[in-house]
Structures are given as C-alpha cells and as structure tokens.
Swiss-Prot record:
Gene behind the chain: Lsp1beta
Signal peptide residue numbers: 1-16
Entries under PANTHER family matching the protein: FAT-BODY PROTEIN 1-RELATED, LARVAL STORAGE PROTEIN/PHENOLOXIDASE
One example of a Gene Ontology biological process annotation: energy homeostasis
Keywords noted in UniProt: Secreted, Signal, Storage protein
Organism: Drosophila melanogaster (Fruit fly)
Chief location bin: secreted
Record's protein name: Larval serum protein 1 beta chain
Length: 789
C-alpha cells in the first residue's frame, strides 16, 4: 500500500526533504468515502444500464436551473436545448473528444458537473447523465470534473484503461471478456480435464511430456513474445488463485488485510498481446509493445484532461502552470522517447509528415467499440489527399503557414491591434497555446479549431457530423497507437524548434555556475526486460450483478495478462564540489549517442533528442558533495496504480469501519510510467549518453508543492508543480554553440542500456517442467524487491 514517503520519492521530493516539510498520511473520513464509493460505482460497467438503486434515485432529476450553479454559460444552455430537442449524441454511439459536434456537447456537460454548487447537485447530475448521456461523453466530462474541481482533491476514478478496456485491447480479447460466463467456464474446465486425462492415459503420456520435439502444435506460429505458448497456455481464461501480477505486488501480498479482502474474489486472467501478435502490418508493428502500452497512452490522455483545449487559463488557473509551454514541451519529450525506442530496433528518424504525399506506414488498431463497430484502419502507402475534404485541408494548412510566418517575422498583431513580441522566451506560451488550439490562443478566430480539424481530417469526419466512424485519432487515449501520430506531432514540434532557433544561444556566462564543479557521476547498470502484468478489465463483464441487503457484491474480476517493457532499478551518484553553501537544482537527461547507421550525432543536432528524466532541488554544502539518486525518485514518474477491484474493496472496508483509507492509496493520475524511462536497448548493450547539470535555484512564483497536497494531487492550476522557473528542457531548449556550451557544472556520461530476455529459459526443449501451467515459481521471485537476473 502506498504511503506518503513512497509518493515523496515518486514526485522527486526525497532529496529535497530539507526544503519541503514532510507530510503525514491523511485518512479519509466518512463523507469522503461516501463520495469515493459513488464515483467508483457510477462508472462500473459504464456501457450497461445503471443497476445501483440508490444512484438511480439520485438521477431522477437533472438540475438545469441557474440557481444551482456558481456560473451558467452558453454551453450549458446549448446542452439543455439539445437535450430537449433529442439532439444529444445517442447512447451507444462512438464519441470522439476531437469531433467538433461531440466536443461542444461534452463541454456543456462538463460545465454542469464543474459549476454545481454542492455535492448533492453534482451527484444528481452525474447519476442522471450516467443514465441518459452517451457513455464516452459522460466519462470524458466526469473525468475532467473530478480532476479540476477544487473541492474534489483526493477523489479519484479508476484508470481510463479500467473504465474502457475496449480502447486498449484487441477485439479478440474484448470478445472473450464480454462473453465470459463463470458457470460455462467451470463446465468447460471440467470437460477439458476429463478429456486430457483420458487422452494422456490412453496414449501412455504423462503431464511432464505433454509435447515432444516433433510436435507441430508446439512450433506453429511461434513468436518469441508469446509467453503463454512458451508455458503451454492458450488464449482463454484461467483462474488466478495466487496473486495479481504487478511490479509492487509485494507491498500487498504480505498484508493480512489485503489477503483477507481478496480471498473471496474469483479472479481470472487471459493472455493478451498487442497488434503485432495478430498481424505484422509493417515494420512499425515491432514497436506496438511500446506505442500501444497502456501507461504510455494513459499519460497522454491525462495530460489532455489536465490541460484540455477548451479550459481557459483564467477560470481554471491553468496559466499559472505555463500550460502552453508545458503541453508543447511534453510533445517534444514524448517524441524524443519514441525516437530512442526506434533506435533500439535499428529504425531511424521519425518520418516527415506531408499532407500531399503517401503515408508509408498504415495502421490497423484491431480495436472494437463497445457498440460492436470496429475501428477504421489505414492501408500502407495511404494517400490522404485522394480522400480529402479540401475545404478543411485548406483551413488546416493555412493555419500552419500562418504560424510559421509569424514565427519567422518575430511578432504577431492580433485582430484587436495588439502586438505580441515573439522574440522573447516567454512568448513560447503563446506558441504552445496556438499549436494546441486551446481557448487561450491569441486569436481564437484563427487558431482555436485547427488542431481539432486536423484530427477530424485524419478520421474523415465532417464539420458538423454527429454519427462518426470509430477512429483512433479522435480520442487522446487511442491516438498514440498510430505511427502517423508521431509524424504529425513531429511537425508540431518543429514549430517549437523554429521558435527557439530565433532566441539567442546561451552564452558561457549564462550557463556557468561559478564555484561549482560537477566532478563525476557514477551510473549503475541500465537493464531493461519484459515483465508480465495484470490489468483489471472487470468492466467488460456481462453477468448478472449481485446485491445483498442493498450492497453490491463484487465477487469476480477479470484481468488481462500482458507483457510490457520495464527496467531494473538504477542509481547514479554525483560528486559535486562547491566553494560555498548553494541552493541548486540538478537536472538529468537521457539521449542517443549514435544514429541508426552508427554515426555520432552532433550535440547541436542531438539536443532535440534528449529526454529529461529527473530534476530536483538540493542544498550543496561547502566542499565535496556526494549525492545518490534512485530511479524511483524521479520527479515525474509513478509505479503501477492500484487496480479498480482493490480500490473498491478498500473503499467498502473503510466505509464499514474495517480499514483506514489513506488518500495516497494509489499513484497520481498525471505521472509518467517509471518503467518506460529507458528504451529497450540491446542484449549486447545499446550505447547512449546521459547529461547532468547543476544550476542555481531560481524560485518559481509559488514554491513547489506549497499550495496542494502532493501525496495524492497533481496540483493542476496551482502554479506550484515545478521545482524552479527556468524554461522546460533547459539548457537544451535553445540552439547550442558548442564553443560556448561546455562549462564545469555540466557532465556528460557514456552509458549502455542492456536488454535481458526473461523468456529465454522457456525457449529450450523441456526446459520448463510445468508445461501447461503458469510459472509462479519464477514470477513469485520476479515480483519482489530482490528480483535479480
């Protein structure tokens, strides 16, 4: 179970304990638990009719009257009018957050949730919307309301991949999950056992020789990532009678309350992989384990919930967080991370995007919407121009030309005659707002809708179309699966680099920290591997829900058991000499050393490929400072989140007075997966480089974590999320003069990333004696603090 110290590490506070006071764990009271219980139940099987009688009664009325709200605007009025005219997006239809007609209705619904004066009004509206509003729109609006309401700190929803597993797993798996029936499963298991007993006794085999080297069934369609075949398992449901696979499960499976809580839950898992398993569509399919990773996609989803394009900076205080710069910097960082993963497979630069040339890499997401309609796919060498909406294309390309032109000119004159200087570093905020197409853009007439139109164009959705075919590019939680996403967003990042090109390069005097020298940095071994994890997909169950004395009995859970990239914990130790006591910030970056041809990339070019992995405050003493930093302490990363099943059980136990529910029981929604910090690397070692820099502490307007509780909140809009006020990515944010760049308070370190094949023991004939059963003897050690290769 998470405790405050664990989150301190995840948020990069451990090394700054002298600067930020420690924080005691807060325990939820009865009122909080009532609200948390409501939120968990209201999204349970969200595509099915609501079955909780208490919530059905709560939702008998929707409060449309202005007196129930702190603010009442045009979008709320339009939503109400659409409801009266039966013009809302129907339940069961595909919802796209980047479909213009859908987004306008979602904004109205969000406002009804966000501006509700009290919990009673909010809960009534949510319960009503759960029964009457499109499921996708409902979850989208509810997620943003829970994140942004100031009186909801600590409240949470299940992860988006637990609410809608259909958006993250292939249609074959979804079909098996939705038709799962416990009684039928029991019968099939019994029949299979009887059949196998007869078969092997008749043929004189025993279970230790269930396959031979001549068995075609063992070798056919074999792929090295198919761990279930290596263990002799099929793609169907198995009972999970030991423990849920998760990297931090050792925190739970030794706790008596957790064991007692979970013993009555029937747990089942089914092996599932990525699109590469069903079809190697093109070479990009090799990267599907990364681009379709649940944590990778969820990070982008929550970033765009935190800083949604229709939330204005003044009302929601997003301007305090440098929302435009932060969004654009995240685009850059995600592209850098993706590029490093490409290098692990010998792929080169992310291809350039063109509106008028073929898109070489097609994509088939193999997803199915919960209404049964499959997602559209794109063929290899697809020509978008052939199927274009030319009016929409003109608007999109016109925007891009306009923004490139104003960056080159160095200023912009708005429609009301105001001139903005684009040669100042802080102008990156305006550029970021324009590129995101958010409501804080300088001229809403020109810049607000281009981003949405671009995604609609990719999905062949018209301006006012309501009935839209499912497409991954229309929702934040699915778009990063598509290789075209990275091509298109590379063109967005190029505007960022174009803007930075016109800013003056940092001089040696600006980069130098007098009296401080970084003498050495020792980095431990960097090793990646593929582990297995269970994702909670219980929301896809279709069996009858059981209630006893009015209480819901959660007696069964389904899990998707999936292979995913991870890394061993690593550390680095700084040796820094200082002439006096100094308040500093230490930054760490990871970047490539060579391109796909083995050629060294110059620093002037390579700066765009570095990804910042750590940043923390420290007080140097006079003399030599030895500072050890663990990978678990990185400021923006999180471990595996507690599953939906466990969170609901913890809530109910606490509600009944049998458990103290800590508000930091799960990880903050905004964190980047710790396990994806390192690219896969090579078995022989992939050469990379790390960059470290110590800079003077430049205090932000609000001291980090001073205005929100960092143990369970992301502090969106607080202005206190960042350790200092330097530009994001400093000193790689601007072009580099290599004659001026290198100073004593910097340090470059050549490193190698090794990849260990954890499945190798199963490749050999008869190397696994328990063939036909999951190997808990190996994974029991695998999921402990002491796991070693």
């Amino acid at each position: 179970m998470k405790i405050a110290i664990a989150l301190l590490a995840c948020l990069g506070l451990a090394a700054a304990a002298s600067f930020h006071q420690t924080h005691e764990v807060k325990i939820a009271d009865k009122a909080f638990l009532m609200k948390q219980k409501f939120l968990f139940e209201i999204v349970y099987r969200v595509e099915d009719p609501l079955m909780f009688e208490d919530h059905i009664k709560q939702g008998e009325k929707f409060y449309f009257e202005e007196s129930y709200y702190t603010h009442y605007d045009m979008y709320m009025k339009k939503f109400f009018e659409a409801y009266k005219a039966h013009a809302l997006l129907p339940k069961g239809e595909f919802f796209g957050a980047l479909v213009m007609s859908h987004a306008k209705q979602a904004r109205g619904l969000f406002n009804f949730f966000y501006y509700a004066k009290d919990w009673e009004t909010f809960a009534a509206n949510v319960a009503w919307a759960r029964m009457h509003v499109n499921e996708g729109m409902f979850v989208y609006a509810l997620t943003m309301a829970v994140i942004h309401r100031n009186d909801f700190h600590g409240l949470m929803l299940p992860s988006i991949y637990e609410i809608f597993p259909q958006f993250f797993f292939n249609s074959k798996f979804v079909f098996e999950a939705e038709k799962f029936d416990y009684e039928m499963w029991m019968k099939m298991t019994m029949y299979e056992k009887e059949y196998m007993d007869v078969y092997y006794k008749t043929n004189g085999y025993d279970y230790s020789t269930m396959y031979r080297s001549s068995d075609y069934t063992y070798m056919k369609d074999f792929k090295t990532w198919q761990w279930w075949k290596l263990m002799g398992l099929g793609e169907h449901w198995y009972t999970e009678d030991k423990f849920i696979l998760r990297e931090n499960i050792y925190e739970f499976n030794q706790e008596t309350k957790w064991l007692s809580m979970m013993k009555d839950v029937k747990k089942f898992y089914m092996p599932v992989d990525y699109t590469r398993d069903l079809n190697l569509y093109n070479k990009e399919s090799k990267l599907s384990y990364f681009t379709e990773d649940l944590g990778w996609n969820a990070y982008w989803y929550y970033l765009n919930m935190d800083y949604s394009f229709f939330l204005d900076g003044n009302t929601f205080d997003l301007k305090n967080d440098r929302r435009g710069e932060w969004w654009l910097y995240n685009v850059h960082q995600l592209l850098s991370r993706y590029y490093m993963e490409r290098l692990s497979h010998g792929f080169g630069e992310i291809p350039e995007f063109s509106w008028y040339q073929q898109i070489e890499m097609g994509y088939d997401p193999q997803l199915i919407y919960y209404n049964g309609i499959g997602y559209s796919f794109r063929k290899n060498y697809y020509e978008m121009e052939t199927y274009a909406n030319y009016d929409m294309l003109d608007k999109i390309t016109g925007f891009l030309k306009r923004i490139h032109n104003i960056v080159e000119m160095g200023y912009y004159k708005t429609a009301d005659g105001h001139t903005i200087d684009l040669r100042k570093p802080e102008a990156i905020e305006f550029i970021g707002n324009m590129l995101q197409g958010n409501v804080d853009a300088m001229d809403k007439m020109f810049y607000q809708f281009w981003y949405m139109l671009a995604h609609m164009y990719f999905a062949d959705a018209d301006y006012y179309q309501m009935d839209v075919y499912p497409n991954v590019m229309l929702n934040f939680e699915t778009m990063m699966r598509d290789p075209m996403y990275y091509m298109f967003y590379k063109s967005i990042a190029q505007v960022y680099f174009q803007f930075m090109h016109y800013l003056p390069k940092y001089t040696k005097e600006q980069l130098l920290m007098p009296g401080v020298t970084m003498k050495n940095v020792e980095v431990s071994d960097l090793t990646t591997y593929f582990d297995l994890v269970d994702f909670d997909v219980t929301n896809m169950l279709n069996d009858k829900m059981i209630f006893q004395d009015g209480k819901f009995v959660w007696d069964m859970s389904l899990f998707a058991r999936q292979m995913r990239l991870n890394h061993k914990p690593f550390t680095y130790t700084y040796t820094i000499e200082s002439e006096k006591v100094e308040k500093v910030v230490i930054r760490a970056f990871l970047g490539p050393k060579f391109d796909e041809f083995g050629k060294v990339i110059s620093l002037a070019e390579n700066r765009m490929n570095f990804m910042e992995i750590d940043e923390f405050y420290y007080e140097l003493k006079a003399g030599t400072n030895k500072i050890t930093r663990k990978s678990s302490e990185f400021y923006w990363t999180v471990k595996d989140r507690t599953t939906y099943t466990e969170l609901y059980y913890y809530t109910m136990m606490a509600f009944d007075g049998k458990y103290d529910f800590p508000l930091d029981i799960s990880e903050p929604h905004c964190g980047f997966p710790d396990r994806l910090v390192l690219p896969m690397g090579w078995q022989k070692g992939m050469p990379m480089q790390m960059f470290f820099m110590v800079v003077p502490y430049v205090a932000p307007a609000h001291e980090q974590f001073s205005t929100f509780d960092y143990t369970y909140s992301c502090g969106i809009g607080s202005g206190a999320r960042y350790v200092d006020s330097l530009p994001f990515g400093y000193p790689f944010d601007r072009a580099i003069d290599e004659y001026e760049f290198f100073v004593p308070n910097m340090y470059f370190k050549d490193v190698s990333i090794y990849h260990a094949d954890t499945m190798e023991p199963y490749y050999k004939y008869k190397s696994y004696s328990n063939y036909g059963h999951f190997d808990y003897t190996f994974f029991n050690d695998y999921y402990t603090k002491y796991f070693k290769f």
